[in-house]
Curated annotation (Swiss-Prot):
The modification Phosphoserine is found at S1263. Residues 558-652, 672-766, 771-869 form the Fibronectin type-III domain. It is found in: Membrane. This is Roundabout homolog 3. Interacts (via Fibronectin type-III 1 domain) with NELL2 (via the EGF domains) with a 3:3 stoichiometry; this interaction promotes oligomerization of ROBO3 resulting in the repulsion of commissural axons in the midline.
Length: 1402
């Protein structure tokens, strides 16, 4: 109601706003609305309206035109929405909306509609309605504008509802990766429209993509390589217009593979010395460490693994040599680091070299023999030279210096320059030793010149603690005196740190950091002096000692004597030639000059001369100069060339003041450059700074040179700076991870000045920029579960540092098959084991430096073969099982399975309920039996007489007096169906006769019938060996005769005289037809017994014992039984005498199972009298051949119908003592006469009642023994039978139905009514032509029952009828009469004349 009021108010407001804006528009709107109505119904238009015939169109009228088209909308459920539509036309068109072709009802037309049509024509939805089953607002809408001139339609606009379900189709799962590995978290969002957008959150922070590392594609969160900081809780977020959904949190666990902080190193120790291998690792989770020896066991008793995981071995011996490996592993990965141990004996001299003095041109040899373990290597070195002489290596073309394989040094044709100390060194892995000897040359002197330094000290980089020799070999005459100074400080000979030898060599035994600096060798004599400068500096840890020379490694030989070619006042031009015997190539030349006018020393006047000719400028005029030339090579300066001849410059001008010819060179030599510590600015970039001391006015620029440290032969890379004031520069493009040596040299007008000591700086490492080379994958030893991955290091230019380790991945087609390993930097292969056979793997290798992991190699595919005894089927099935498991875990499958199980459970419950209900409905069928006779009309050919067909010879055909619903015996396919049946399947339920006798009385009657005679002329044929009779078989011990020729004849005629009013046969209808036995009724019915065979047993009636506990159970109906009537007189029944029995066997009464009324018992008879059913003779009764007497005067019913067509009285027939067997008919209903006294007790053996199991839930299909007895044929005479047929045939169906009204007659005690009230002349007796005395009718004619024929039933329904009425149980004293289920008892009794009299047997 509230919603309706809101809609109404909204409509009113909209309409009021429209009126306020434009009243004329409202009138036009009204006009348009009326026009649209008229367009829809032309009868509404006034006569002559132009919209009827189109002949009167206004000059300004126009057809509608859509000017604003409705757009496509996607809206959220529950939100308002508007589909705009505006149209033009005159008169103003009316707007209508259509959805999917159907007109849309708005609130203007239907107050219940939730859509509103706005004055502008727009369709307004206050709230979009959308559900799982009902989606009324979603669809395709069309706006139609109409006036009398026509209509215009808009475009089709779709309105879609945004939907976003709650459940994610796949929620992200926890992921565990190692640092550096890729990680993928998958998420499939819930279904929605529009398709939801997927984003990710870490905690509460939205993730953003990082180029090259974090990518979000299709709901997947992909990380190319993970960091430790990536660990955390991640959520998948799906959003669209309908809202936002967050998945459950998934954890990303980033573990760290073991990595070494300190690795074990290779160690060489002497025997009996201890050794310690360090190993320190980190990882997450904390790795476990253990040690192993690759080629043996750890030395027992001498090793110890300390708390810091280091391996300590004491007193090592040669047996301990080998490789020791530290193994660290955790759940993420495994890492190994190895160190080797070597135990050696240091080398020792066997023969040492001795000093020798020879003349120039002679040959000389120095012996040097050593020993050690392993054997040491021997090499020679001339003191002060960097050249090493190894065995079998010729250093000069003529081979003057040669070392033999035994270590002997041989010098041929000794020259003056060969003099000096020669050092023999023996080196092995255990250590090194050396010894030296002096070679002196006789007659080598120069007179009148300052000392000449033949070989001076070289610049050296030394390791702290090492020994160093600084040679200073000088010639001169007189013999010069050699002195040393360090950093401009003279060294004294008594200094314990420095040892000044006799030949001028300075020896420093164990150099310390304080010993580093500038050293100068000064040779002085009386004529002059000579100076040679050099420096020493500390070698850093990264430094490397120079290796053996691979080519000529000695300095170039001395050039030839320089020759003066041109002389001026200020310059001299010199020419020389290189030494042809030099083993090394001269790269440049240095020119030295001496002039007594300039001083008493040799000075360098030119440096870096590239050609063999040079012009020395800046000389003083008219001055004598001497020159010598030195060659410069990769291994240092050569010895000086022979001194040139003296040369004097020209005299230019006597007035010009004399100038110092060495002023420029001397000034640059005094400029000192001091380097500062370089600064790393970035990758591959270094800033170099320096300071300048001395005469800076002579400096015109600087030369900055650098090279990779450890390569003394490496070339320098130079950068010239032309600015004298710039004292810093930036070096770019430096190799990563390398140690760089840098030096600075000043530049002036006269050339280059002194060099600065070089400094060393490390360039930061970078991750390798190139992948490892030659990656290959080979199958392992087992060839189906392991592979070996091998590789080579990256190219040197791509390493960018020292390779510390390699990362190797072996990736399967799923993340759970991924494996990874790490290997040391020196390793070249690794083996993966435990792989799955048949799986395809990709192998990748990446090198790593301290800066990180570099570029991985291209994947190399390898597929492991299946084992020989295995096939790929299990693998495929395993994969299929895994895929099925994934499908089973999907929410959609679980929801569908739950729905299916629920539907099955619901169906099962419904079936169970229906079955229970049917059981309840059929519960009375389980313990009851009934039959409903129906009217049948015979065919003439079936009733023509005894000659055309046997009297009972229906054969396999059905009985015409039985309803079609009565089960018939089996027939052959050729048997014909009985014709003339009426109402075969739907008998009138009102035409049933109910017997209220309880089950207890029924059982009691059955027990009494076991040894009693029958109750009337109704016969019961029971197969004593039938299946259903086994229940009651114990109650008939006298029926155990095995004679197959005997028949059972019973039911004396005295019992047939009871009036119908005294026969209260009551019944109940069977639920369904049941199967008939294979035996037909004509085969089972015996001829009627004579009346003389019956006798009356006497004795008081005895109440059945144990009946109360059986009242709720009803046994199955016997296979074939006939209704039994009770006698109406108080006379006792007479048992048949054997002598009066016309039958071949004696007949004994057997209680009919079709009645529930107790009957007098029969006296015990011999068991041989009762044959089994299958032993009875199949005799055909003949027609009547002797006069018959009917036991009752009237044969028609009270309704005027012949006997057999109505519920008339039961007749009793007596067979005459004729040898020809007679036939008898039975009444259609079962009647009995109940006396006022108790039923006489049974005589003889009490029938033992066998209780039938109660386990049967219901009985739809009854066995042959469950059938109620069929009615016997009606009595007839030759003259009365046609009449009976005519009466039956002349009745209409309506009359027959009326004749079927139920009449339940109360049993009246004997003597309670006068005989005349009980019996009287039957109104139809004359019609049938029957005499008052009893007569016999021929037996064998079929009886035709009316449609309303009564039935008898045993019931266990929860009513009084289940326990029986007083009358059905028998009255006891004051017990009243039985109940009546039909019309009044008085009316029923008044219509029946009293016929109760006792018939004596004839």
């Amino acid at each position: 109601m509230l919603r309706y009021l809101l809609k109404t108010l909204l409509q009113m407001n909209l309409f009021a706003d429209s009126l306020a804006r434009d009243i004329s528009n409202s009138s036009e709107l009204l006009f348009g609305f009326n026009s649209s109505l008229a367009a829809l119904n032309p009868s509404l238009l006034p006569p002559g309206d132009p919209s009827l015939n189109g002949s009167r169109v206004g000059p300004e009228d126009a057809m509608p035109r859509i000017v604003e088209q409705p757009p496509d909308l996607v809206v959220s459920r529950g939100e308002p929405a508007t589909l705009p539509c505006r149209a033009e036309g005159r008169p103003r068109p009316n707007i209508e909306w259509y959805k999917n072709g159907a007109r849309v009802a708005t609130a203007r037309e239907d107050p219940r509609a939730h859509r509103l049509l706005l004055p502008s024509g727009a369709l307004f939805f206050p709230r979009i309605v959308h559900g799982r089953r009902s989606r009324p607002d979603e669809g395709v809408y069309t706006c139609v504008a109409r006036n009398y001139l026509g209509a215009a339609a808009s475009r089709n606009a779709s309105l879609e509802v945004a939907v976003l379900r709650d459940d994610f189709r796949q929620s992200p799962g926890n992921v565990v990766v190692a640092v550096g590995e890729p990680a993928v978290m998958e998420c499939v969002p819930p279904k929605g429209h529009p398709e939801p957008l997927v984003t990710w959150k870490k905690g509460k922070i939205k993730l953003k993509e990082e180029e090259g590392r974090i990518t979000i594609r299709g709901g997947k969160l992909m990380m190319s390589h993970t960091f430790k900081s990536d660990a955390g809780m991640y959520m998948c977020v799906a959003s669209n217009m309908a809202g936002e959904r967050e998945s459950g949190a998934a954890e990303l666990v980033v573990l760290e593979r073991p990595s070494f902080l300190r690795r074990p190193i290779n160690q060489v120790v002497l025997a009996d010395a201890p050794v310690n291998f360090l190993c320190e690792v980190q990882g997450d989770p904390q790795p476990n460490l253990h040690w192993r020896k690759d080629d043996g066991e750890l030395p027992a008793g001498r090793y110890e693994i300390r708390s810091d995981h280091s391996l300590w071995i004491d007193q090592v011996s040669s047996e301990d040599e080998g490789t020791y490996t530290c193994v660290a592993e955790n759940s993420v990965g495994r890492a190994e680091a190895s160190g080797s141990l070597s135990v050696h004996v240091p080398p020792q001299f066997v023969t040492k070299p001795q000093n020798q003095t020879v003349a120039p041109g002679a040959n000389v040899s120095f012996q040097c023999e050593t020993k050690g373990n392993p054997p040491p290597a021997i090499f020679w070195q001339k003191e002060g030279s960097q050249v090493l002489l190894f065995p079998s290596q010729s250093l000069q073309p003529m081979g003057r210096l040669l070392v033999s394989p035994r270590g002997q040094l041989n010098i041929t044709e000794v020259k003056i320059g060969d003099g000096g100390y020669y050092v023999c060194q023996a080196v092995s892995v255990a250590g090194s030793i050396l010894a030296k000897a002096l070679l002196e040359i006789k007659g080598a002197s120069i007179d009148g010149l300052p000392p000449i330094i033949l070989q001076g000290p070289a610049n050296q980089t030394l390791v702290l603690g090492s020994s160093v020799w600084l040679p200073c070999r000088v010639i001169g005459n007189p013999q010069p005196n050699i002195q040393w100074k360090k950093d401009e400080r003279w060294l004294q000979g008594d200094d314990s740190q420095f040892n000044l030898m006799d030949n001028g060599t300075l020896h420093i035994a164990s150099i310390q950091e304080m010993d580093m600096g500038f050293y100068s060798c000064v040779a002085k004599s009386s004529i002059g002096e000579a100076t040679w400068n050099s420096w020493l500096r500390k070698q850093e840890d990264w430094g490397a000692s120079p290796g053996p020379a691979t080519g000529p490694s000695n300095p170039p030989g001395p050039p030839s004597q320089p020759i003066v070619t041109e002389v001026t006042a200020n310059s001299i031009t010199l020419t020389w030639k290189p030494n042809p015997q030099s083993g090394a190539t001269a790269t440049s030349y240095v020119i030295e000059a001496f002039s007594q006018a300039a001083g008493n020393t040799w000075r360098t006047v030119a440096d870096g001369v590239q050609l063999e000719t040079y012009t020395i400028s800046g000389l003083q005029p008219n001055t004598i100069y001497l020159f010598l030339v030195r060659a410069v090579g990769a291994w240092g300066l050569s010895e000086p060339s022979p001194v040139s001849e003296p040369v004097q410059t020209q005299d230019s001008s006597l007035s010009r003041p004399a100038e110092d010819p060495w002023k420029g060179q001397r000034g640059l030599a005094e400029v000192a450059v001091r380097m500062q510590e370089p600064t790393v600015l970035g990758p591959r970039t270094l800033q170099v700074s320096w300071t300048v001391d001395g005469p800076v006015q002579l400096v015109q620029g600087f030369r900055v040179s650098w090279r990779i440290a450890g390569l003394d032969q490496g070339s320098w890379t130079m950068l010239d700076l032309q600015s004298p004031h710039k004292q810093s520069t930036v070096l770019r493009g430096l190799p990563p991870g390398a140690q760089i040596q840098i030096k600075v040299q000043v530049q002036g007008q006269e050339g280059l000045g002194a060099e600065s000591p070089f400094v060393t700086r490390s360039i930061p490492e970078e991750a390798p920029s190139g992948p490892p080379q030659g990656v290959a994958v080979a199958l392992g030893g087992d060839r189906n579960s392991s592979v070996t991955v091998s590789w080579e290091p990256p190219l040197p230019s791509q390493r960018n540092g020292v390779i510390t380790e390699y990362q190797i991945w072996c990736l399967g087609n799923e993340s759970r098959f991924h494996l990874n390993r790490s290997a040391a930097g020196w390793a070249r292969s690794v083996t993966f084991s435990g792989l799955l056979p048949g799986q395809i793997y990709r192998a990748l290798v990446a090198a790593a430096t301290s800066a990180g992991v570099g570029v991985a190699s291209a994947p190399v595919l390898v597929q492991l073969p299946f084992p020989p005894a295995a096939e790929p089927g299990p693998e495929v099935s395993e994969g299929l099982a895994e895929r099925l498991a994934k499908v089973l875990r999907k929410p959609a499958f679980l929801a569908g399975s739950s729905a299916a199980c629920g539907a099955l459970l619901l169906g099962f419950c419904a079936a169970l309920y229906r079955r229970q209900k049917q059981r309840k409905e059929l519960s009375h069928y389980t313990a009851s039996f009934a039959y409903t006779p129906a009217v049948s009309f015979p065919h003439s050919e079936g009733l023509s007489g005894s000659s055309s067909r046997p009297p009972m010879g229906l054969g396999p055909a059905a009985y015409p007096w039985l309803a079609d619903s009565w089960p018939h015996p089996p027939r052959s396919p050729s048997a014909q169906e009985p014709r003339g049946s009426c109402c075969p399947s739907n008998p009138d339920p009102d035409d049933r006769y109910y017997n209220e006798a309880g089950i207890s009385l029924y059982l009691a009657q059955t027990a009494r019938g076991a040894n009693a005679s029958g109750e009337g002329p109704v016969y019961s044929t029971i197969d004593p060996v039938g299946e259903e009779l086994q229940t009651f078989h114990g109650g008939f011990p006298q029926h155990s005769s095995g004679d197959p020729s005997t028949w059972s004849q019973y039911a004396p005629p005295e019992w047939s005289e009871g009036d119908s009013g005294a026969r209260g046969g009551q019944g109940k209808l069977l639920g369904k037809p049941v199967q008939m036995p294979s035996l037909s009724w004509p085969e089972a019915l015996p001829p009627p017994p004579p009346s003389c065979e019956l006798s009356c047993p006497e004795g008081p009636e005895e109440e059945l014992k144990g009946s109360s506990d059986l009242e709720e159970w009803c046994p199955p109906v016997p296979e074939k039984s006939h209704l039994v009537g009770s006698s109406s007189s108080g006379a006792c029944m007479v048992a048949p005498a054997p002598r009066d029995t016309p039958s071949p066997t004696s007949s004994y009464g057997q209680q009919s199972t079709a009645t529930l009324t107790p009957s007098p018992p029969d006296p015990p008879q011999p068991p041989t009298d009762i044959p089994h059913l299958h032993q009875m003779p199949r005799r055909v009764p003949l027609g009547p051949s002797s006069p018959l007497s009917v036991s009752q005067p009237a044969l028609s019913s009270h309704d005027g119908r012949p006997v057999g067509l109505g519920a008339g009285p039961v007749l009793s027939y007596h067979a005459s003592p004729s040898p020809v067997p007679s036939t008898a008919s039975s009444a259609p209903g079962r009647t009995r006469q109940v006396t006022g006294e108790m039923t006489p007790p049974l005589h003889g053996h009490r029938a033992r009642i066998r209780k039938k199991p109660k386990a049967l839930p219901y009985r739809r299909e009854h066995s042959p023994g469950d059938l109620p007895p069929p009615p016997l044929p009606p009595p007839e005479e030759e003259t009365s039978w046609p009449l009976g047929l005519r009466a039956a045939g002349s009745m209409s169906s309506l009359e027959r139905e009326r004749s079927g009204e139920r009449r339940v007659v109360q049993a009246v005690p004997l003597g309670a009514q006068p005989l005349g009230a009980q019996r009287g002349p039957h109104p139809d007796a004359a019609l049938l032509g029957c005499a008052a005395e009893e007569a016999w009718l021929p037996y064998g004619r079929p009886s035709f029952l009316s449609h309303g024929q009564g039935t008898s039933t045993c019931s266990t329904a929860g009513s009084n009828s289940s326990r029986g009425s007083n009358s059905s149980r028998g009255s006891r004293g004051s017990r009243g009469p039985g109940r009546s289920r039909s019309r009044s008892r008085s009316q029923s009794q008044s219509q029946r004349p009293g016929r109760n009299r006792r018939e004596e047997p004839r």
